[in-house]
Amino acid sequence: MAFAPQFTVTARLLRELETIADLKAKIATAAIQVTWTPRLQQDSRQRGAHASTAIEGNPLTLAEVRALEGGTPLPDHTERAQREVLNYFASLRWIEKRAKQSKPITHEDIFRLHQLLAGGVMDQGEAGRYRTIAVRVGKHLLPSPDLVSGFMRELLAWWNGPSAEWSPVLTSAILHYQFEDIHPFADGNGRAGRMLALWELYRRGFDTHHIFSIDEFYGEDRPRYYAGLAAVPGAGGDLTAWLEYTTEGVRTTLERVWLRVQQLAAKSGPKKTVLRPSQEKLLRLLRDHHEGLAPAELWAALAVTKQGAAHILAPLLKTKLIRRVGTRKNGRYLLA
């Protein structure tokens, strides 16, 4: 039986989608300098990691998440608490790469994502394998283990096919809910479901620059988030109220991104920094290497000499887009 989500396109839903489209266009055409993008990406990545793990009870603050990504150990927190956050970052890097591929999404992709996200931090079951035990969320008894694979097959068929007819804002929310309703793994379904929703936005080109995360909206009012999920079965499976809630979240998140863009524009002033391709490449490298790069690693990655690297680095250091930390002998370059 094919998966066919039930919902009604209400006036509220249309208003939210129209506002979202307007905000998205403003952000895309706001002359966002490439120099800003790594900062926005880093901020979004860290806020998403903090929010999604905090929803599940992780105790790290946003400041601690930022420090952990930068390579600072947190001795006051358990290894598991830190591993949950590091797993989130690893999963995010994976979906960023996978979203660029046009091939259909498979069970193996879902397994791989779950392995990255839940490896070493599960209370029960095995990361990367569908559950073999019965689970319940509140009063809601979820599908029996023998039905999980079939339900996931139906969801993937919809995701790889009919979902393309709808806005990614809607399909990401539908994926999120349906994945949680199936609850295919013994543990880690919440983080995985939110990551699937983000994956859908990436692969459909909605968040091309990867500069926002709706998880922060969910995390700010967890009771409302859980109530939104729990209300769907009581509505006979109708997703309308859930979609109205999630589109409100996307709109709120984009409003915040737009504010951050304006703040960055104000700080940078009217003069724009024009970057050479090698400098853009360096910023992308530093975005992906959160622990930074040593000078020798930087020269090798850019295929330049020490002198050539100096010409690339100087304008970025002067405009405070990057910074150097450590000693003269053991220093590293990081995004500012």
Region spans (language model):
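FIC/Doc superfamily catalytic core
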Residues: 1-336
